[in-house]
Amino acid sequence: GYQFHSETDSEVVVHMMDYYYKKEKNLQKALERVITRIEGSYALCIVSTIEPDKVFIAKKDSPLVIGKTADASVAASDIPAILDYTKDVYFLEDYEIAILNKGNVSFFDQYGNPIEKEITTIPYDNEAAQKGGYDTFMLKEIHEQPYAIAETLRGRVEGTDRIILPELDAIHDKFKTFNKAYFVACGTAYHACLSGANILERLTGIPTFTQVASEFRYCDPIVDEKTMCVFVSQSGETADTMAALRLAKEKGCTTIAVANVLGSSISREADHTIYTCAGPEIAVASTKAYTTQLIVLLLLGMYISQALGNENEDYKRIIEGIASLPQHIENILKDEKTFEHYASYLKDLKDTYYIGRSLDYATVLEGALKLKEVSYVHADAYIAGELKHGPIALIEQGSLVIAVATQPNIAAKTISNIQETIARGANVILFTIDGQEVGNVKETYILPDVDPILQSVLVAVPLQLIAYYAAGLKGCDVDKPRNLAKSVTVE
């Protein structure tokens, strides 16, 4: 038997390697035996005094990337960790084995047969993963959004009447066969899905559903070969989203991934992948990845609408508005001091409430999540029309309500709900459009004049800055909030 000296499950692997090495007298053969026995997710880098010049590597579900230079080989769980050494990388698939030594990498399948792997060249360097003069990564990434959105749009919008997504050209005619669509993700990406699903259904008439990835596998989704499933993940490694993707593929769905990290697991397993072009996002709280996800999901909805022959004047107006988004966000960022002032309302509060309707509801969910993540202020987001069904009992003198009303067809309804909170003593910060101002609110910010379907992208930026400055007032580490990780690679 073996005596254990720690409480980590990884020690099991060490003892199993020892056990099988004694049988096989070969470290690679021992590792092949080990990976057929262990269960769960793992990324293994094994070194031994028996062959000290080699590193033996294997993975299942967990991310692992390998880099190679002329005189060195490196491995890490994420691309930025190795960009100081090389931009040429390999992505290991589940149950594959890599053996690293100086300047050389060999790859094998789980049975020991040699295999060839293609090199992927990463299109950015590690300078993009530095603070670049900003105090924090989060603030830097908020300010990078105009550029990130422009890069995400580059080559995908032609003139004023055409969306180009060559990643989906192979299924251009297949969109006519889908009778439903699912959008699946976790956290911030799920909020992007709520907007994307709303837009797709609005533009195409395809019945569209959203589901949190951790629930998708267990709700027995009624999906089949006539279902399109869209999976969104910044890292492309989110374990719950990966598991949901695999279930959808088992059921015959057409799967589309939206990811930011080139060569990530989700992007490799999905039938088709559309990349956001946000560049590396280091802060745990997502900002530029979120707004570029919104952009890609908007482009997806418009591309499918185009494939179905649904172009009209509204369609052309939206395309014209898309091109203006980077400049509008530049202008919003010039009002940063205004949003820092809005954050001062949160200094001594333990609770705040966000309200909106339709697309604005998805936006306030994300705004509330940002505040919770980085400032640890309890924040709840509600559909404005649901206030009277319970949540309004929480509103009292001095409560803070952050309201978003950017959809002209329902803004009057939201404004009525805002007045209800004011009557009960709430202080209201309102983000709205010209002509929808409300009396007696504490603060009003008028957003640029764009098509309502685009407002989610714009209003996200002030909400991010409010969360950022509220965290600063409370002395919180915005880049590394407590109990959170950038990429959640366990279920």
List each model region and its residues:
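Conserved short alpha-helical segments that host acidic/polar catalytic motifs at enzyme active sites
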Residues: 1-135, 144-179, 218, 330-333, ...
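Conserved phosphate/anionic-ligand binding catalytic regions in large, soluble enzymes, centered on
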Residues: 57-66, 134-138, 149, 183, ...
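A residue-level signal for conserved active-site and pocket-lining positions in enzyme catalytic cores
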Residues: 13, 44, 61, 98, ...
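Short, glycine-/Ser/Thr-/acidic-enriched flexible segments
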Residues: 49-52, 62-64, 69-73, 79-82, ...
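Glycine-rich phosphate-binding loops that contact phosphosugars or nucleotide phosphates
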Residues: 176-310, 315-324, 404-447, 466, ...
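Generic C-terminus detector
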Residues: 112, 440, 450-491
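Active-site phosphate/pyrophosphate-binding segments
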Residues: 36, 145-149, 153-182, 262, ...
